């Protein structure tokens, strides 16, 4: 379990440094699909400070930190540079990766950040089109020109710079063109991922900034489809079976845990919806934290919610959290039966 990885200094953490974001991506967990100009009502706006980070990690015993965001972009975190510097200065081998839309700050900021992280830092910029119209149909509120300038600045350093493209029908024929465009700015590493919030069908409707209904469409080219697995992360949508034979936890396989911007240590991003139940007491809870996709909250998840102080880095250290019976035993035991596993565990990590 995770405690073994921590004791061996092999644990990796995905840390959400902020819930602030400059973009309005329709399928993002923070975005109100009925008005993309707004965030979800329940989501608090906060960010991790350098003092928070030092308190959470007085000793750096983590193999890799990944700064991304289910609810925010790490580029919006005011203390991003001092946090990266703290990790570099207080560890010998710990590596860092940062996933960002890149349409904030200026070239000097990203150049300086790479100067701090050097070979131990990877920046992953999101580029979703060959022009502003294509790029911003999904990556709304961002400037492709600004992203490319920031990419070019980062590529002048010894840090690794990558580009990630989220694939939809509107850009699936332009993936090679997007990558060739980015090569001109110095990028050598590329990755793609399907837009994967297509649970009920191949279209995703949302209301744009002008109050008009728009729709994202799922990729149609079979040679682009990535199927059930992508780098050991399971992707579920309407195309895939719902029955499974066993649960193989992708987060455990990757030696990974999530840390929210409020300091909660959570097994994976799919279970991060339990934060809504903790911080926002009204409204319907997410199906992922139930047992069968509806009804009451899964008992194991309810225990986490009731005891959330025990999983908060403001109250416990990471060593105590991964040694807690909930992490060391209970969650694994829950995977043995459809009647005890959470809906998220079955839906996302159930092998057909």
What are these model-derived regions, one by one?
Residues 1-122, 133, 137, 141, ...:
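Conserved alpha-helical substructure of the radical SAM core
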Residues 8-10, 221, 340, 346:
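Sequence-level motif detector for i,i+2 pairs with an aromatic at +2
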Residues 11, 251-253, 343:
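Short, basic and Ser/Thr-rich N-terminal targeting/leader segments
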Residues 109-110, 318, 341, 345:
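Hydrophobic side chains within well-formed alpha-helices
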């Amino acid at each position: 379990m995770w405690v073994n990885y921590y004791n061996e200094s092999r644990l990796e953490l995905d840390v959400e440094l902020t819930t602030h974001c400059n973009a309005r991506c329709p399928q993002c967990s923070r975005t109100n699909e009925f008005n993309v100009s707004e965030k979800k009502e329940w989501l608090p706006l906060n960010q991790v400070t350098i003092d928070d980070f030092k308190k959470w990690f007085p000793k750096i015993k983590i193999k890799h930190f990944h700064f991304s965001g289910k609810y925010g972009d790490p580029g919006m975190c005011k203390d991003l540079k001092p946090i990266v510097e703290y990790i570099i200065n207080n560890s010998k081998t710990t590596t860092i990766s940062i996933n960002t839309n890149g349409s904030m700050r200026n070239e000097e900021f990203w150049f300086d950040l790479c100067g701090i992280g050097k070979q131990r830092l990877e920046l992953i910029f999101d580029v979703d089109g060959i022009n502003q119209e294509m790029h911003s149909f999904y990556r709304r509120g961002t400037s492709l020109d600004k992203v490319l300038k920031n990419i070019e600045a980062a590529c002048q350093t010894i840090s690794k710079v990558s580009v990630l493209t989220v694939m939809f029908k509107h850009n699936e024929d332009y993936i090679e063109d997007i990558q060739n465009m980015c090569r001109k700015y110095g990028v050598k590493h590329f990755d793609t991922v399907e837009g994967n919030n297509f649970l009920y069908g191949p279209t995703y409707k949302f209301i744009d900034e002008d109050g008009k209904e728009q729709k994202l469409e799922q990729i149609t080219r079979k040679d682009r489809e990535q199927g059930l697995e992508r780098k050991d992360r399971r992707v579920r949508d309407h195309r895939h079976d719902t029955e499974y034979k066993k649960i193989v936890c992708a987060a455990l396989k990757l030696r990974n845990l999530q840390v929210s911007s409020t300091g909660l240590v959570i097994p994976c991003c799919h279970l991060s919806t339990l934060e809504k139940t903790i911080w926002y007491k009204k409204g319907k809870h997410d199906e992922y934290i139930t047992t069968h996709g509806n009804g009451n909250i899964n008992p194991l998840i309810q225990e986490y919610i009731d005891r959330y102080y025990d999983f908060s880095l403001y109250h416990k250290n990471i060593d105590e959290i991964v040694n807690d019976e909930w992490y060391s035993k209970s969650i694994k035991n829950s995977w043995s039966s459809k009647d005890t596993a959470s809906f998220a565990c079955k839906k996302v990590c159930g092998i057909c």
